[in-house]
């Protein structure tokens, strides 16, 4: 039976850090652990407004690599696009192969799912039951890969990761908690995206103004606010939401952002392995025989996690 750790509401006025520390998932890890953070996948309906469509194969190659190499996958919010889409039916149909891979992570107890503003509906305790009823109206076995996963996993607002060698904690959450339009007013923003911006998407380069990923100045302000949260808490925090991949130098900050999966021709992730943290880009390349392949590059780090803990201690 699915357990939800927060009702589908959001307010910047509440102390969301304490809420995450109290109700979030707890993960202990050490220098032998391998963890990957991926956010803002925005799995959609396969149509023109499906932001993942162009990077589907890159994303699939990345998660297959992480499954094969025994990583714990933390989906850090906005995994499914539930602002543009009223339910999961088209998403379940178009991404059957993806949900099969994610289910393999879950069978190994190596999958954690965080909800963001675009999939806040997952915080509703009856959400999966409602989706199951919709699927049954379509066909008896429709959406079985998605349902097999979502009926057997918890959705959290955030995760507390404890690094055993140092006895220090890392906080991971989507990041919309500091964004008024996408937290307090998320239902209004969803309405605007679903019924106004989506039909206009693609027309003369139109972008939804409520999205930090479509508004660089807004995204940067949110990133600055999240860095302030990290300094105030004196903790490493890892977020998504703004789609801006961020990897600070040890002496510069404690706020990391894993970027997104929807920018043209590449996706970004954050990896923790051997006590080191790295920012990784996956993209399409062409070899000398004109064959396309997916290439993984480290674009930030690797840096020792303990160096950031030491920096936080001296703030």
Predicted feature residues:
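Extended recognition/assembly regions associated with phosphoester-bond processing machinery
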Residues: 1-75, 79-315
């Amino acid at each position: 039976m699915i357990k939800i750790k927060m009702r589908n509401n959001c307010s910047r006025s509440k102390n969301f850090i304490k809420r995450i520390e109290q109700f979030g998932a707890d993960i202990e890890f050490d220098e032998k652990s391998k963890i990957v953070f991926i956010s803002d996948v925005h799995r959609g309906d396969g149509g023109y407004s499906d932001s993942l469509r162009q990077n589907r194969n890159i994303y699939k190659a990345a998660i297959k690599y992480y499954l094969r190499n025994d990583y714990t996958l933390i989906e850090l919010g906005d995994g499914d696009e539930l602002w543009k889409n009223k339910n999961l039916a088209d998403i379940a149909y178009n991404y059957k192969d993806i949900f099969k891979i994610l289910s393999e992570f879950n069978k190994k107890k190596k999958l954690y799912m965080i909800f963001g503003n675009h999939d806040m509906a997952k915080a509703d305790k009856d959400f999966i039951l409602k989706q199951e009823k919709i699927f049954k109206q379509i066909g008896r076995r429709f959406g079985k890969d998605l349902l097999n996963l979502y009926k057997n996993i918890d959705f959290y607002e955030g995760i507390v990761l404890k690094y055993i060698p140092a006895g220090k904690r890392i906080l991971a959450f989507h990041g919309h908690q500091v964004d008024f339009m996408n937290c307090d007013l998320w239902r209004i923003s969803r309405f605007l995206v679903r019924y106004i911006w989506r039909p206009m998407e693609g027309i003369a380069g139109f972008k939804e103004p409520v999205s930090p990923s479509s508004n660089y100045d807004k995204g940067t302000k949110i990133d600055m606010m999240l860095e302030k949260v990290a300094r105030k808490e004196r903790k490493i925090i890892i977020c998504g939401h703004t789609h801006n991949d961020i990897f600070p130098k040890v002496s510069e900050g404690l706020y990391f952002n894993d970027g997104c999966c929807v920018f043209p021709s590449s996706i970004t992730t954050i990896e923790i392995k051997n006590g080191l943290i790295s920012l990784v880009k996956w993209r399409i390349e062409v070899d000398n025989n004109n064959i396309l392949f997916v290439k993984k590059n480290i674009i930030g780090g690797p840096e020792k996690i303990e160096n950031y803990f030491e920096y936080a201690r001296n703030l």
